[in-house]
């Protein structure tokens, strides 16, 4: 904890937000229990991670209710402060404006702070591509969900859970422009510690148990319509327009249980590198994404293409046989090589010459219902590179669009009946100092207005089997189908 004199010295240096940190011994809590005690409500989030399919990441991040929220719909920005819309304006370059918003907050980088201690948190929906590629700006499909194209919360109060040490870091950012800023931040930290010490989180039992299964999810396509879409995609491939494209289907079901219960079930069923629960008040996002979109950290840019899928085996022996089959499949290997090349091209546009490398190639990662081939491409970022530059170079992921990317996106616009909204976009954080970590929004549910929506795609190449591609999308959705069924039944 910084002293009052240290705080005043930081104010004198011109910082616009100053973090105060309280370290709490919290070995009897979990990240989820801390979320329920401190954050359960609108404009909050919980981020967790499982590395290598088996080991929980060291840090979990809990976002307490954000007072300021930025929403973008097309080129119209809306700013909400403490529940009131305070600003609406047109933006010529929305992504440049987001970088300006981040730069408004000058925060000292103190040695005791974790990698993320505050900043912008939220999502960039799939239609963000319209800000990057003007010819894709008119996504003239029905907008079934109506979610903002971009939504970012200003995370000024966060709790960072150290899973290794059983310690919790409560972080409150004081605004020096406010009277008694230091004392108010201390009082806020005292109140948070008090809430932590009040025993278990309040969590009433579900009043109505509902039986759901996979057949209750209704697709935007019939099976026959999806297979016909695959055939149309293959016609473009045969004509030489593209090498690959990734069409998807959306599956929806009525849902009135607690959204956080879907997260509870999902983190047990399908632990993944990116686990997230984001409560936006009128909607919730629940996901267990296996795939990074892009990470910018300490001057390094990383993407990690994930493509090539098999269902999990019933035994370890069957898993190993399926892994060998997957790695030997010429179609899967060709598709994966194509996406490594796309990643190298994307990273090469924003990296120092000669620094781009494939640091991991054709590894297998196992998840609850499927296994994937994964590789990693990284480079040394160009000087003064911002995450918005990274987003422009890498968005959307080639694994959710195709190659060549722009033509594949045009074909997706033609083939799919709805805007993708959050699906296949990016979810994560941009820190005060410019580092960022975002996942691709796959294996993700969006809950709003009494309905829950899941979306999944399949990579189509010249010899794809339409029936097999339908089944691949269903396999990718099954962890969520099971989690939703458990939540509806009651945990």
Regions found by a protein language model. Name each.
Residues 1-491:
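Extended alpha-helical targeting/anchoring segments
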């Amino acid at each position: 904890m910084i002293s009052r004199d240290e705080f005043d010295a930081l104010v004198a240096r011109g910082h616009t937000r100053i973090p105060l940190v309280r370290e709490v011994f919290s070995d009897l809590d979990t990240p989820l229990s801390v979320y329920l005690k401190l954050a359960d409500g609108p404009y909050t989030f919980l981020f967790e991670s499982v590395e290598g399919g088996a080991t929980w990441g060291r840090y979990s991040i809990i976002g307490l209710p954000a007072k300021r929220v930025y929403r973008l719909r097309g080129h119209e920005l809306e700013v909400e402060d403490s529940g009131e819309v305070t600003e609406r304006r047109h933006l010529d370059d929305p992504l440049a404006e987001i970088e300006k918003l981040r730069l408004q907050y000058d925060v000292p980088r103190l040695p005791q702070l974790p990698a993320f201690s505050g900043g912008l948190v939220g999502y960039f929906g799939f239609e963000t591509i319209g800000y990057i590629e003007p010819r894709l700006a008119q996504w003239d499909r029905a907008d079934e969900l109506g979610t903002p194209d971009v939504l970012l919360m200003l995370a000024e109060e966060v709790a960072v859970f150290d899973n290794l040490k059983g310690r919790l870091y409560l972080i409150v950012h004081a605004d020096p422009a406010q009277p008694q800023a230091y004392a108010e931040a201390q009082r806020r930290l005292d109140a948070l510690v008090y809430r932590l010490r009040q025993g278990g989180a309040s969590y009433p039992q579900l009043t109505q148990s509902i039986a759901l299964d996979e057949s209750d999810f209704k697709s935007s396509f019939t099976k026959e319509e999806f297979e016909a879409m695959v055939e149309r995609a293959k016609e473009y491939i045969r004509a030489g327009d593209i090498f690959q494209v990734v069409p998807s289907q959306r599956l929806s079901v009525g849902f009135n249980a607690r959204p956080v219960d879907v997260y509870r079930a999902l983190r047990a069923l399908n632990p993944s590198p990116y686990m997230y629960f984001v409560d936006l008040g009128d909607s919730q996002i629940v996901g267990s994404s296996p795939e990074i979109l892009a990470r910018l950290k300490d001057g390094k840019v990383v993407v990690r293409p994930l493509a090539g899928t098999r269902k999990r085996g019933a035994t370890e022996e069957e898993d190993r046989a399926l892994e060998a089959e997957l790695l030997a499949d010429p179609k899967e290997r060709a598709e994966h090589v194509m996406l490594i090349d796309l990643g190298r091209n994307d990273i090469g546009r924003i990296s120092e010459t000669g620094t781009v490398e494939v640091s991991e190639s054709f590894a297998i990662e196992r998840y609850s219902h499927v296994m994937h081939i994964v590789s990693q491409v990284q480079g040394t970022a160009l000087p003064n590179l911002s995450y918005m530059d990274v987003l422009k170079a890498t968005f959307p992921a080639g694994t959710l669009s195709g190659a060549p990317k722009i033509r594949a996106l045009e074909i997706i616009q033609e083939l799919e009946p709805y805007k993708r909204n959050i699906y296949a976009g990016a979810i994560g954080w941009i820190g005060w100092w410019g580092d960022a970590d975002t996942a691709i929004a796959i294996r993700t549910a969006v809950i709003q207005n009494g309905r829950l929506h899941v979306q999944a795609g399949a990579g189509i190449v010249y010899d794809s089997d339409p029936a097999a591609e339908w089944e691949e999308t269903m396999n990718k959705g099954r962890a969520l189908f099971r989690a939703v069924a458990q939540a509806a039944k009651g945990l």
